[in-house]
């Protein structure tokens, strides 16, 4: 098989990617409804891209109003689903204190530069109401197939070697993540004042995995209970 063929096997089809997004949305929405206050009205997604997950939170959760911020946005826009999306970074949230009941922080922390991690969690804490919650997900950098590059053992390498190895990645984007674990995130959240309410291992079902390597996911099913693809978490700003 050619190198191009091998790379193609590591990428999800449109249907597999759509299934992945649906699974992620459903699991995060369940956490929002379980841990947010019964009268919660306002949510914000940190790192919303173009608002696909933001919109899903409005559809799937009891929280009716959602907004989002993303550094790639150049101006304020309204998504097709009616969510207002703003340019911005987690380290500088342009909202008043105690604005939101829920902050969604899914697959974002690993992209935050080290010198912005503490201030980012402090900013999220600031814009949450007392009793507000952070719901999110963090990919495991030590999972055998690293999620950003789709390459084996990328997260185990020193950063300099990661950039060299990235040239073999089948993806169209560049290297843009840091190796951080749930322990790093929990410590950062606790320094900001959050209580850790819940952490769980999370793995996507086989139908999300590219069909060409789905057999490997089935073989790894048992080890993945201990070495998960990612962690999902809930942090609470004390009331």
What is the meaning of each model-derived region?
Residues 107-111:
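Short catalytic micro-motifs in class I SAM-dependent methyltransferases
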Residues 118-133:
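A short glycine-rich, Lys/Arg-flanked "PGG" loop and its adjoining helix->strand segment in the class I
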Residues 51, 113-117, 146:
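Short N-terminal helix/helix-N-cap motif within the alpha/beta-hydrolase-1
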Residues 79-81, 145-150, 208-212:
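Short aromatic-enriched loop/helix-cap "lid" or pocket-rim segments at secondary-structure transitions
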Residues 134-160:
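Conserved class I S-adenosyl-L-methionine
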Residues 182-190, 194-239:
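A C-terminal cap/extension of S-adenosyl-L-methionine-dependent methyltransferases
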Residues 169-183:
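Acceptor-substrate binding/catalytic loop of class I
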Residues 1-96, 102-106, 121, 229:
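Conserved N-terminal segment of class I S-adenosyl-L-methionine
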